[in-house]
Amino acid sequence: MGARASVLSGGKLDAWEKIRLRPGGKKKYRLKHLVWASRELERFALNPGLLETPEGCLQIIEQIQPAIKTGTEELKSLFNLVAVLYCVHRKIDVKDTKEALDKIEEIQNKSQQKTQQAAADKEKDNKVSQNYPIVQNAQGQMVHQAISPRTLNAWVKVVEEKAFSPEVIPMFSALSEGATPQDLNAMLNTVGGHQAAMQMLKDTINEEAAEWDRVHPVHAGPIPPGQMREPRGSDIAGTTSTLQEQIAWMTGNPAIPVGDIYKRWIILGLNKIVRMYSPVSILDIKQGPKEPFRDYVDRFFKTLRAEQATQDVKNWMTETLLVQNANPDCKTILRALGQGASIEEMMTACQGVGGPSHKARVLAEAMSQVTNTNTAIMMQKGNFKGQRKFVKCFNCGKEGHIARNCRAPRKKGCWKCGREGHQMKDCTERQAKFFRENLAFQQREARKFSPEQARTNSPTSRELRVRRGDDPLSEAGAAEGQGTSLSFPQITLWQRPLVTVKIEGQLREALLDTGADDTVLEEINLPGKWKPKMIGGIGGFIKVRQYEQVAIEICGKKAIGTVLVGPTPVNIIGRNILTQIGCTLNFPISPIETVPVKLKPGMDGPKVKQWPLTEEKIKALTEICTEMEKEGKISRIGPENPYSTPIFAIKKKDSTKWRKLVDFRELNKRTQDFWEVQLGIPHPAGLKKKKSVSVLDVGDAYFSVPLDKEFRKYTAFTIPSINNETPGIRYQYNVLPQGWKGSPAIFQSSMTKILAPFREQNPEMVIYQYMDDLYVGSDLEIGQHRAKIEELRAHLLKWGFTTPDKKHQKEPPFLWMGYELHPDKWTVQTVKLPEKDSWTVNDIQKLVGKLNWASQIYPNIKVKQLCKLLRGAKALTDIIPLTKEAELELAENREILREPIHGVYYDPSKDLIAEIRKQGQGQWTYQIYQEPFKNLKTGKYAKMRTAHTNDIKQLTEAVQKISTESIVIWGKIPKFRLPIQKETWETWWTEYWQATWIPEWEFVNTPHLVKLWYQLETEPIAGAETYYIDGAANRETKLGKAGYVTDRGKQKVVSLTETTNQKTELQAIYLALQDSGLEVNIVTDSQYALGIIQAQPDKSESELVNQIIEELIKKEKVYLSWVPAHKGIGGNEQVDKLVSSGVRKVLFLDGIDKAQEEHERYHNNWRAVASDFNLPPIVAKEIVASCDKCQLKGEAMHGQVDCSPGIWQLDCTHLEGQVILVAVHVASGYIEAEVIPAETGKETAYFLLKLASRWPVKVIHTDNGSNFTSAAVKAACWWADIQQEFGIPYNPQSQGVVESMNKELKKIIGQVRDQAEHLKTAVQMAVFIHNFKRKGGIGGYSAGERIIDIIATDIQTKELQKQISNIQKFRVYYRDSRDPIWKGPAKLLWKGEGAVVIQDNSEIKVVPRREAKIIRDYGKQMAGDDCVASRQDED
């Protein structure tokens, strides 16, 4: 560290530590930043010594600067640090990083001209090239020095470790400094195994080479003598030029830097590859259920910076996607904050919010009163009939449970003889001799388990075990027992438990019988007196002699008791002796199958150092871990495990006990992702009414499930010692740890598998499972129901899951998942709003959480005003004064919660009805019921998805939200009762350009009816004045103009400041509305303004739009039309010139007429128009929008579908009384469609076979129509090896892709229908247009191009996988020039013409082909002295 920290010294270091990281920030640069920068430079193969001089800093800046745009945050931080360091070296006074960057930019701009002039002078002087690969020999000739294996090795390492992440580009730039095209090709060949990436790179090089040839045409005529030919594109790429030609071009006068040109092409290709290999889209950034909001915002903006989009689009993404992709808890608060909230306000409002922990806090407070009451009642009901006798487990040594309930692991090995290496069925021992040492007897320590032991190794049979009982022995027995090493036999019941026993010194073979009361032996001579007795058995009564005080020894354990001697068919040791020696009948826990877990590819386990802990925390952790080790939950490990995760301890709430916490954040980052088994919590409104109900809780849920053996090493942690007195104690987990990301998913999956057999055997039992909470309901009588519950508990216990009695709820009301369940109704657990004189931010957050929870059954609850209080950057402890509106809202909510409200249970035989009511201020409430005044569920909706909206749009959004919620809870959509008249709805619906599906509904006359405040005409108004409006603004000066020209000669222009083009267009509409009569025609060339007004908003966040709405309401009739700009339309051209004067430059474009002509024929979308005719997107959109057939509706809104190349969706749609069968390739959007004679299975199967003969079809997804479920379709699927999947009934979203394509196809058919006589012709024309004349989506392709690209890529990927698997069958023996001894075998990674890339242990090397021998790996074989690597067959 000393060497690295010596970059600055004395006064320079003082100056360095005064510079701030950010303008106005508190943090300043420190010495540690220089140490970090040195390490980063080593990673990028740059010399850290360059930091010591200003010249070196400039060199680093020149290397890093080209990669800043695509680089990571670490790369940008490194660039900023070097810029500041340069200023310190040069003694340039800067206060923060931003000033330093400005200085660097200024210096670079000033020196640019000097550098160019110096370069020109250098060329004139014809000095020797100093480029590294081209050197001057002793004769003065320019010769090539081949790129070194060390450089190639470094490049291969970069690609293998970074996997084409953004850091690859600066590394390539640094390693290829001054290289010739031949050197660059050598570098590319060493990573040729990445075929997909290399193909992309090759395509980019070919495109750039073609562009070079186009820009540099060949000169006519022969080349003059002594003059070199000019390089073509293929010459620069090194394919048609020699090394000597490349050197001549690079060192000539004037020089043609073919190496640098080719390098630039490669970097362009690498940029494309980086984007492909790091496909992080802003749409994929979503907040996890437990992720803090601040972390989510950091990830969001990090990805946003990398997005290729304009600033306007990025602003829109911030306003819309940031809230949309937040988790439900944060989303509720963010939406209540409204559109105008800043990032700081959002982050303050969402402090400590989100995930189950937040819900738990809300529920815990709501339950506090109930829990306290119940605890008191339980204590009063306690039965204190006598002191309970404690039992002790002989498996782990702990008191309080017996061995069959023990969770500690069982010992491995044969269950009969105890030895490892074979199973019981292969055992040759005649009788059990499985002795365990260190019994858990009284006054003895529990046996220790080996670290690798786990429950997964436990036997699955019943077994008989012998242990020391509680009954006291005689003095002789006790004395003798104390001197004997006690052992522990374990006998399985696969065979009869026969053992050899010693009775008064005589050996006999006897059966251990736990069902027999007495010990009965065949004829044996025993000393002492006896008395006659008659005993009953299965075969009748027999006469026996009864001997008292007989000494018996069984498996080394002694007992004294009564023995009966008589004609018994087999010697029996009964319970009178077995209880003395502590024999028990055990039911070992069945093994739970472990789920295999891996780290993310290319990652290693966490190596985070343990931070120091206080003495009391170390003592607490030591005690906790000792207990956990005894129970088998964790195991001790040695120094061979290199991984580490920090642990700490906190005190439990309202307790003196400590709780162990493990900081698994680093491991969670490195662990593979898991699919959430359960996407939400079950809701009581979806429960069916049941006669009998029970609620169970699984104790120590995670610790009952074993962790994958191969993954355990990564959970290692250390308990340090005080003052480092001794090395820390190291442990690893054997079971699922708390806080690890995989625990919830694995536990849910394991629990589901375990419950599956019980569910199959007891279909009458309904089990709702969420984590460790179980709701069990049935229509059985209470006695039968409770018997089944005990069966379920026993079933769970067999797998190691205990269900504690204290959490077993048998009588209503049942407390479950935060709800209170009664036999015929349900409610949320008691919600009490606190009474406070002053409210902090944290108090209001908790209050909003409680109210949101209560709103699912209490109607009309509002939180908007309370959420407004959370705006602004405030700390959690800041006191917030309540506004009058918030106080009123809180008082109303208190009144609503005063009377308890209950919901009822679902009846499948009755219809669902959803009624929505408007509350005003953009807030809505809804009630879902089956009978009036008996609500199943209530809720509220207060979203404002766009800046300008109206009540009808909000109502539509609320309907869609309730539909989705209903499908999740009940599996069907309710009938809706909406506060809007049919006429109002139809008027808006037919005009609204982006209409979406909503279900069946009827009008309900409730207060706050929804209505349209104004209506736009569909045709021009005869006799009304026509206003041609326009607006323009200058982006730099923010100055603008808005105005109009009328058909009657009126005109007006106003000047505006601090405005934009969009604002001026809206201002022009406002001017026209202000100055016009009650009826007016308005013509605009702005799609933006037209889109806002045509949606008929009645409220907006924009003050200007609200003013426009007020003017529209005053008018009797308004007609608003759009015309394309700059097309010579009279009034539009006049007003354009009027407002453009001195503000903007008008751009006239060629190709518009051809684009319009093609659009009129094919009705292609705007992306295809822009691509085919090289037009800007805004012009292409205007052409499409001006088409009367394409202006009916907007384009479909695209979602995200996870799909593979072989999946197709099929559906039938109807048009003109005929059936059209449509097939859509999900991944590409490619369509195949035909008009079929009838909707039958036969026609469908024939269509499916035609589809399979043209395209690779692996899976088809259809609805449950009779033609798709027919035997003919099943037969076709069987023959063509196609898997058929079905959608969800009543759920249109399950067939979303094909449903969307049906609408799209019908729209295109409508556009071309007048060009065809028959429908079947129009269908094929529409399919052609969709597949080949509409571009967009992934890659900007048409659907036809995209499907071919996807299939070709799939084939290439499969071939690549085959090659990789084939090449891994070979091993390489190699040597280098310095050491003639052969080394190996190493793993073959890639084989080229002149060299091979190998992996020896963890090191990747490039070895010349002549120094390597490649040998097929035939597995492990015994090699003799004459078996030498060089004699084997080479590849």
Curated annotation (Swiss-Prot):
GO CC terms of this entry: host cell; host cell nucleus; host cell plasma membrane; host multivesicular body; membrane; viral nucleocapsid; virion membrane
EC number(s) per entry: 3.4.23.16, 2.7.7.49, 2.7.7.7, 3.1.26.13
Residue ranges annotated as motif Tryptophan repeat motif: 985-1001
Cofactor note: Binds 2 magnesium ions for reverse transcriptase polymerase activity. Binds 2 magnesium ions for ribonuclease H (RNase H) activity. Substrate-binding is a precondition for magnesium binding.
Modified-residue entries (Phosphotyrosine), positions: 132
Region (RT 'primer grip'): 814-822
Reported cofactor(s): Mg(2+)
Covalent lipid adducts (N-myristoyl glycine), residues: 2
Zinc finger map (Integrase-type): 1150-1191
Site (Essential for RT p66/p51 heterodimerization): 988, 1001
Keyword terms of this UniProt record: Activation of host caspases by virus, AIDS, Aspartyl protease, Capsid protein, DNA integration, DNA recombination, DNA-binding, DNA-directed DNA polymerase, Endonuclease, Eukaryotic host gene expression shutoff by virus, Eukaryotic host translation shutoff by virus, Host cell membrane, Host cytoplasm, Host endosome, Host gene expression shutoff by virus, Host membrane, Host nucleus, Host-virus interaction, Hydrolase, Lipid-binding, Lipoprotein, Magnesium, Membrane, Metal-binding, Modulation of host cell apoptosis by virus, Multifunctional enzyme, Myristate, Nuclease, Nucleotidyltransferase, Phosphoprotein, Protease, Repeat, RNA-binding, RNA-directed DNA polymerase, Transferase, Viral genome integration, Viral nucleoprotein, Viral penetration into host nucleus, Viral release from host cell, Virion, Virion maturation, Virus entry into host cell, Zinc, Zinc-finger
Motif Nuclear export signal positions after renumbering to this chain: 16-22
Active site location: 513 (for protease activity)
Comp. bias regions, Basic and acidic residues: 462-471
Domain Integrase catalytic: 1201-1351
Name of the protein in its database record: Gag-Pol polyprotein
